[in-house]
Each structure stands twice: as structure tokens, then as C-alpha cells.
Amino acid sequence: MAKEEVLEFPGVVTELLPNAMFRVKLENEHEIIAHTAGRMRKNRIRVLAGDKVLVEMTPYDLTKGRITYRFK
């Protein structure tokens, strides 16, 4: 099964939410709810408020996303 077309946006984590969810403000000023990708959980990469991240979203639901990368 081919991977769906995904949209990637850089953003900043503004708030930590329960259940390993994060509120992320994207560069285009939209705010979304995102969770960490499985590889980030597996490698124990911590995400804190104020971190710059790369968020992956589907074109079907633009209010939720997945954090795939934390910039240094």
C-alpha cells in the first residue's frame, strides 16, 4: 500500500497536553494538536514546550498531525 500524500510544516510546540499530545503553532499561524511519531517514541526523543519541530499532516484533517522531527 502506497503512502498517502502528506503535508509537512515547521512549527513550535506551545503547550504540552495529556496523553503525549502537544499543541503546535505552525509557521502559517495555525494551531494544531499533534502526537509524536513512533520512531521518536522508540528512540526516546523528548519534546518540550518551545521546541521547533516538523509536523506531518494529512490533507483530510488539518487540525491534527504527527511530530516527525525535533530541530536542534
From Swiss-Prot:
Sequence ranges assigned to domain S1-like in this UniProt record: 1-72
Domain of life: Bacteria
Protein keywords: Cytoplasm, Initiation factor, Protein biosynthesis, RNA-binding, rRNA-binding
Localization, UniProt: Cytoplasm
Keyword Protein biosynthesis: yes
Key word Cell division present: no
One MF annotation (Gene Ontology) recorded for this entry: ribosome binding
Main location: cytoplasm
Stored InterPro entries: NA-bd_OB-fold (IPR012340), RNA-binding_domain_S1_IF1 (IPR006196), S1_domain (IPR003029), TIF_IF1 (IPR004368)
GO cellular component: cytosol
Subunit annotation: Component of the 30S ribosomal translation pre-initiation complex which assembles on the 30S ribosome in the order IF-2 and IF-3, IF-1 and N-formylmethionyl-tRNA(fMet); mRNA recruitment can occur at any time during PIC assembly.
Function statement: One of the essential components for the initiation of protein synthesis. Stabilizes the binding of IF-2 and IF-3 on the 30S subunit to which N-formylmethionyl-tRNA(fMet) subsequently binds. Helps modulate mRNA selection, yielding the 30S pre-initiation complex (PIC). Upon addition of the 50S ribosomal subunit IF-1, IF-2 and IF-3 are released leaving the mature 70S translation initiation complex.
Family of the protein in this entry: Belongs to the IF-1 family.
Protein name: Translation initiation factor IF-1
